[in-house]
């Protein structure tokens, strides 16, 4: 996750990571970070989950993700959650459990590579971003892939947000 993106918008963030070196580097960079495994009881409390407005889970480990969500909801039922997954099946399961956003990490990586390739061929940023966004919402393999039993959804980029500056 890109902690600096939140800091540049003056949004509070606390990172929990089980990699001690990464935690130290984050702290050295001014990012509040806690060393530990968020799927272990007590860690989310230490991170202030009770005051959180959003839980972002970036681990690709499905069982760990489910456990983190379970623990977080014990502390703060209804917490908005965004998660990284490794499969469409996991996306479907997490969405059925009320997760706000579940994305397949490898797919989002491929979108980033495709965007770079489009830029490299001289496609404008506006057209490249539109092409990538169209892939996301078209059902052609995006995080927002529509299953037959579900209505079409909008990608977060298309949802109404606070007015742009």
Where are these regions (language model features)?
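Cytosolic regulatory regions of ion transport systems
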Residues: 1-165
């Amino acid at each position: 996750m890109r902690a600096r993106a939140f800091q540049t918008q003056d949004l509070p963030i606390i990172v929990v990571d089980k990699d001690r070196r990464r935690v130290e580097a984050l702290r050295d960079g001014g990012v509040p970070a806690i060393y530990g495994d968020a799927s272990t009881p007590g860690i989310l409390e230490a991170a202030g989950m009770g005051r959180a407005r959003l839980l972002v889970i970036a681990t690709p480990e499905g069982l760990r993700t489910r456990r983190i969500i379970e623990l977080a909801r014990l502390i703060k039922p209804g917490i908005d959650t965004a998660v990284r997954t490794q499969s469409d099946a996991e996306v479907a399961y997490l969405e059925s459990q009320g997760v706000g956003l579940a994305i397949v990490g490898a797919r989002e990586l491929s979108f980033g590579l495709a965007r770079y390739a489009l830029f490299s061929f001289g496609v404008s940023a506006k057209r490249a971003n539109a092409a990538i966004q169209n892939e996301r919402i078209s059902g052609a393999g995006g995080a927002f892939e529509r299953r037959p039993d579900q209505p079409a959804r909008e990608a977060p980029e298309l949802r109404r947000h606070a007015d742009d500056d």
